[in-house]
């Protein structure tokens, strides 16, 4: 796998305790399973549990449907078992590469996956950690606003994002149905809520769904420290405040569109 593995014991425990009976009606109709084109986006700020929930959702769905793909975010993506995303983020934080170079690297990871996993193919369930759009509108914008990226660099990155979305038919947030998921408490409860919505979406022909994860401030900081990524721990705290505000605003917009 080219994403961060989660313990098989956790996968088995969650699957054992999640009610998936709602899939039976879908699976008994071959016409339903052969014509599913559905994009699932697991999004949110840093430390809200995106990777874990995206991977658990993948583990559940891949055993039920024929063509399920997962698209980890750059920080979870591995090349030859090396977390290149984490290395690149360290270089950016320590100013050994420019913010613009780093943001193009993030889009490189997206484009590599979208191309080689056949994102634009029909009859596929795609699970994405965030959208490419978020990389630019939240994270690149922070670098642009504080002067790390020039006006020309900002324009070039935005143009590249538009081209990627168009070429691979990637949805944007405003095109997606939205559901906010509280991931403060038992993980199995959050996964169950997501599975219930996925079942309804497939039955009703929904094509794009964003699940926005939320946790309280103490919980997300505890997760950042516990998983021990130096690149995250060394980041300035006001950066996380910006990320949290961005996703809070995004959730409000998507909830009331």
Each model region followed by its residue ranges:
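Hydrophobic anchor at the beta1->P-loop junction of P-loop NTPases
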Residues: 42
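A glycine- and Lys/Arg-enriched "phosphate-lid" helix/loop adjacent to the NTP-binding pocket
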Residues: 136-249
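Hydrophobic positions on the alpha1 helix immediately C-terminal to the Walker A/P-loop
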Residues: 53, 57
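Phosphate-binding P-loop
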Residues: 26-37
């Amino acid at each position: 796998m080219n994403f961060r593995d989660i313990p098989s014991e956790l996968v088995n425990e969650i699957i054992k305790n999640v009610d998936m009976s709602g899939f039976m009606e879908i699976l008994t109709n071959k016409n339903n399973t052969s014509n599913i084109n559905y994009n699932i986006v697991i999004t949110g700020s840093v430390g809200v549990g995106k990777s874990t929930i995206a991977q658990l959702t993948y583990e559940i769905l891949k055993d039920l449907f024929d063509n399920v793909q997962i698209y980890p975010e750059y920080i979870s993506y591995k090349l030859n078992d090396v977390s290149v995303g984490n290395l690149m983020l360290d270089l950016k934080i320590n100013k050994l590469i420019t913010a613009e170079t780093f943001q193009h690297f993030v889009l490189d990871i997206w484009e590599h996956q979208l191309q080689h996993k056949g994102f634009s193919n029909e009859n596929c369930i795609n699970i994405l950690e965030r959208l490419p759009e978020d990389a630019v509108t939240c994270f690149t914008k922070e670098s642009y606003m504080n002067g790390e990226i020039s006006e020309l660099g900002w324009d070039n990155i935005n143009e590249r994002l538009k081209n990627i979305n168009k070429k691979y038919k990637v949805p944007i947030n405003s095109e997606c149905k939205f559901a906010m998921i509280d991931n403060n408490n038992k993980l199995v409860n959050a996964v169950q809520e997501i599975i219930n919505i996925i079942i309804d979406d497939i039955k009703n022909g929904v094509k794009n769904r964003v699940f926005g994860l939320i946790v309280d401030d103490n919980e997300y900081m505890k997760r950042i420290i516990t998983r021990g990524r130096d690149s995250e721990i060394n980041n300035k705290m006001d950066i996380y405040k910006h990320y949290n505000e961005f996703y809070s605003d995004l959730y409000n917009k998507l909830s009331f569109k």
